[in-house]
């Protein structure tokens, strides 16, 4: 009863959780209610497409997680969606989606999505970088603006591992992401993220 006029005026309900993005579409998660409600999770990406971003929370609620990037058998894999912002007064920010896995012969995996901002807790964790191609291709870097850095992607037979995401600034501060493993035959491991 209270949601209908608020939805009509502001395009967002007063109370309630946002809808999740449908899997395989890369659709963004819906925003949570202005007062109470968590953001919906982003939908995973179709093959080679980016995952959807997580929806933002209102005053109280958690941000939605970013959707995973779509894996690809040829060409580049999709990046993970960004996590949604946490509640302005109370709530946890959403984690970034993992980058898609590349099954091609010479392409990199998808980048991990960034963790959501804000909330009463630390910002959301960055997504893990996608793994590189089976023969050639570097792993993508993990990302984060706050919270824990995402791990770097793993390379294939030849290629460097992705660098880990940097630790986010906050109280307490986030942890750095681990570097991805280099190629099985040739390639360097990725660097650990910075504090």
From Swiss-Prot:
One GO term describing the cellular component: cell surface
Tell me the keywords, alphabetical order: Calcium, Cell wall, Secreted
Task: Give the consequence of mutating residue 166 to A.
Answer: Decreases Ca(2+) binding affinity
- Please classify the protein's predominant subcellular localization into one broad category: secreted
Regulation acting on activity, per entry: Binding of Ca(2+) to PE_PGRS61 induces conformational changes and increases affinity for TLR2.
Protein localization: Secreted, Cell wall; Cell surface
Q: Which family does it belong to?
A: Belongs to the mycobacterial PE family. PGRS subfamily.
Q: How does it assemble?
A: Interacts with human TLR2.
What is the role of the protein in this entry?
Mediates Ca(2+)-dependent up-regulation of the anti-inflammatory cytokine IL-10.
User: What protein name applies here?
Assistant: PE-PGRS family protein PE_PGRS61
Q: Which source organism does the UniProt entry give?
A: Mycobacterium tuberculosis (strain ATCC 25618 / H37Rv)
The gene behind this protein is PE_PGRS61
């Amino acid at each position: 009863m209270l949601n209908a006029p608020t939805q009509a005026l502001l395009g967002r309900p007063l109370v309630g959780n946002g809808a999740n993005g449908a899997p395989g579409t890369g659709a963004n998660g819906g925003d949570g209610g202005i007062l109470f409600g968590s953001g919906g999770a982003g939908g995973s990406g179709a093959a080679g497409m980016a995952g959807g971003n997580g929806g933002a929370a209102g005053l109280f609620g958690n941000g939605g997680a970013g959707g995973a990037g779509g894996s690809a058998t040829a060409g580049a894999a999709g990046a993970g969606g960004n996590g949604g912002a946490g509640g302005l007064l109370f709530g946890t920010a959403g984690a970034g989606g993992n980058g898609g896995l590349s099954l091609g012969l010479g392409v990199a995996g998808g980048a991990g999505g960034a963790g959501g901002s804000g909330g009463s807790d630390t910002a959301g964790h960055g997504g893990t970088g996608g793994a590189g191609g089976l023969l050639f291709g570097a792993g993508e870097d993990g990302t984060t603006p706050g919270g824990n850095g995402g791990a770097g992607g793993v390379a294939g037979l030849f290629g460097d591992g992705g660098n880990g995401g940097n630790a986010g600034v906050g109280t307490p501060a986030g942890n750095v992401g681990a570097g991805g493993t280099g190629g099985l035959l040739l390639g360097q491991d990725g660097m650990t993220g910075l504090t």
